[in-house]
């Protein structure tokens, strides 16, 4: 068997990607289920989420259950032989938490292949919806956790991060405070990643250090839960969590449910699922310190591979363990990613080709016009209330506003990633918007470096599949970095490279200071 499956449970979709490593390694299959298309009416989701107001953004975990069945059925319907899969690994949108009652473990162990997953697992949740990474409603809980461990800097040094509203720990604390009965009914708390892995394994499985880093609960250097952080977060939290499992060690073989229903080999191994950002680190080939990548998705994320856990003192950035089991990743997340791009596109009734043409028709620097595209509350910089700011920019000028939003995103990515202290000599780009060369051209010029685009935009699913392959080929023995390089290299050769224009790069070097002043003045107000 020479095929490996990666599954990515992201915000808006669930994706399967199969690699075939026989002879010439290649991506053999990509298949997705878009949540809004299949489940929008049933679960009331928009862009895969439910906006509950007051900064609360959730998603129904039963929708993810149903999506997994549908995704595997689509693979079979399209003629893909799942019996040839040697192993599966996966990724999940980070920070989201899933709350399960005491019936979950026996229900997973006794799944009937004649029935759907959703029909059998509808009753296993102690909380009907899961707070996800877009939720900003836990500021009070963040401050409480920081105070309980001895202050913001103590938590930063312990976990690699200050308390973030979207992180799992503050969300768990809020649930324990606002619904103590629901918390009492909760026998197990998982992340999106470990929950989907539990479905495939047919039992509750642990979180890995990569995704555990996004909880405010993990000792970043020991790669284990921090007793101090657990105690500061919620009562009896430790018993609701399984011990952290190494990212590179198999957690077992696939559940008989999937072998009988979809034809998986009973010996197909399941490796720990990790977060989507840590898996993208692998999927873009960032397995050596000093390499930098950008994901242009629902949110935009700039991240780098580091050999040490270097924390961001300002609290804007985050540090996670890499699922390579060796390194760390520095990350900064900008919530107004595709959200802002789509808002501008829709405001002027453009399609994506017209959006790209607007960038071609406007000069670098936009004649001095600037935008702060806070269509939603922003993570970096910390902007708690939405509000778009324009300077020397006519709201009626569609082309100028298109350029302004892209230039703002690129300038912000450069400005707020300086803490990583990693020279950006090239930028590997993934995500849906990476298909737009004009957007990438702006990033190449702002960062004054080549931008590389790859065969697939599904870097998290690819990273998961590569983790499954690497795990089967010796990862459990602590494979050295060279082994990772051999694993990722065939899949991370750039398909397209966009070189910076020196003249435009000089324009943006000056523009960066003007953007920084506008941002600071808006935040200070």
Question: Where do the PLM segments sit?
Answer:
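N-terminal glycine/serine-rich phosphate-binding loop of ATP-dependent small-molecule kinases
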Residues: 1-119, 259-260, 264-269, 447-451, ...
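Active-site core segments that coordinate phosphate-bearing ligands/cofactors
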Residues: 5-6, 15-18, 139, 143-159, ...
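Structural signal for short hydrophobic segments within the conserved structured cores
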Residues: 29-31, 131, 242, 452, ...
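Carbohydrate-associated surface elements
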Residues: 135
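A structural motif corresponding to the C-terminal end of an alpha-helix
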Residues: 81, 232-240
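Short beta-strand-loop/turn "lid" adjacent to the catalytic site in phosphate-handling enzymes
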Residues: 51, 55-56, 77-131, 161-166, ...
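Active-site donor-binding loop signature of nucleotide-sugar glycosyltransferases
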Residues: 33-35, 246, 500
